[in-house]
From Swiss-Prot:
HAMAP family: 23SrRNA_methyltr_H (MF_00658). The lineage of its organism: Bacteria, Bacillati, Bacillota, Clostridia, Eubacteriales. Pfam families: SPOUT_MTase. This is Ribosomal RNA large subunit methyltransferase H. Its EC number is 2.1.1.177. One of its GO terms (cellular component) is cytoplasm. Belongs to the RNA methyltransferase RlmH family. The keyword Disulfide bond does not apply. It catalyses: pseudouridine(1915) in 23S rRNA + S-adenosyl-L-methionine = N(3)-methylpseudouridine(1915) in 23S rRNA + S-adenosyl-L-homocysteine + H(+). GO terms for molecular function: rRNA (pseudouridine-N3-)-methyltransferase activity. Specifically methylates the pseudouridine at position 1915 (m3Psi1915) in 23S rRNA. S-adenosyl-L-methionine binds at residues 76, 108, 127-132. It comes from Ruminiclostridium cellulolyticum (strain ATCC 35319 / DSM 5812 / JCM 6584 / H10) (Clostridium cellulolyticum). InterPro entries: Alpha/beta_knot_MTases, RlmH-like, tRNA_m1G_MTases_N. Transmembrane segments: none annotated.
Length: 159
């Protein structure tokens, strides 16, 4: 089993890099984990709708180039399904049991998602209706993936 997290933008803060490193280490017991960072597109504060759309399209193209053919694609999306940690672990287990050997989680840029990403998604996941910095969403996602594996393996985990 391999999990890839493809995200727009690079982690800048040391504490976030340390958290990603820690969860990568923890996850290595259960799965191969790969983190892919693609460049975010420059976007001034005031953009027209067309310019905003162009930024999202360019970021989506960068992400889509990194998705391996045959990978089960999970898109983090505010319009996606909200679930519990137990529900997420059940979903992850079902994906693995149905023969998928590679899952790619996609975290879009700060302006949102291009339609091309929505079209390729096998599943759209909403971590929360609250807004988080994309870098923090990466850490939250990794923690939930780790928690899901602990649930699947019936191992205890601090609640």
């Amino acid at each position: 089993m391999k999990i890839t997290i493809a995200a727009v933008g690079k982690l800048k803060e040391k504490y976030l890099k340390e958290a990603v490193s820690e969860y990568s280490k923890r996850l290595s017991r259960f799965t191969e984990i790969e983190i892919i960072e693609v460049d975010d597109e420059y976007a001034p504060d005031s953009l027209s709708v067309a310019q905003e759309s162009q930024v999202k399209k360019k970021e989506a193209e960068r992400l889509l180039k990194r998705v391996k053919q045959g990978s089960y694609v999970v898109l983090l999306d505010l319009a996606g399904e909200q679930t519990t940690s137990s529900g997420f672990s059940a979903k992850l287990e079902n994906v693995m049991l149905s023969g998928n050997s590679h899952i790619t989680f996609i975290i879009g840029g700060s302006l949102g998602l291009d339609q091309s990403l929505i079209k390729v998604a096998d599943y759209r996941l909403c971590l929360s209706k609250m807004t988080y910095p994309h870098q923090l969403a990466r850490v939250i996602l990794m923690e939930q993936i780790y928690r899901a594996f602990k649930i699947i393996k019936n191992e205890t985990y601090h609640k």
